[in-house]
């Protein structure tokens, strides 16, 4: 089951992909996809510490991070990773089940 994790007050916090890239032990990957001839960047975040990779898609709007999407059943690990990022970058979040 997938889940969406949204940042509270993301417009005020102004967290960017560059901010996420600055956190130690976290890897941000950019994938460029073409949709109807238009290139679109999709960002994923990986935790390098755990043996099994955890992948979260980063939701961005006008350069600001507004949330993350998890497509697997690793809820506890995703929650811990986002909590870790929240501590490092000073943001709070909530989960929206989909």
Model-predicted segments: where are they?
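Acidic (Asp/Glu-rich) sequence patches and key acidic residues
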Residues: 1-98
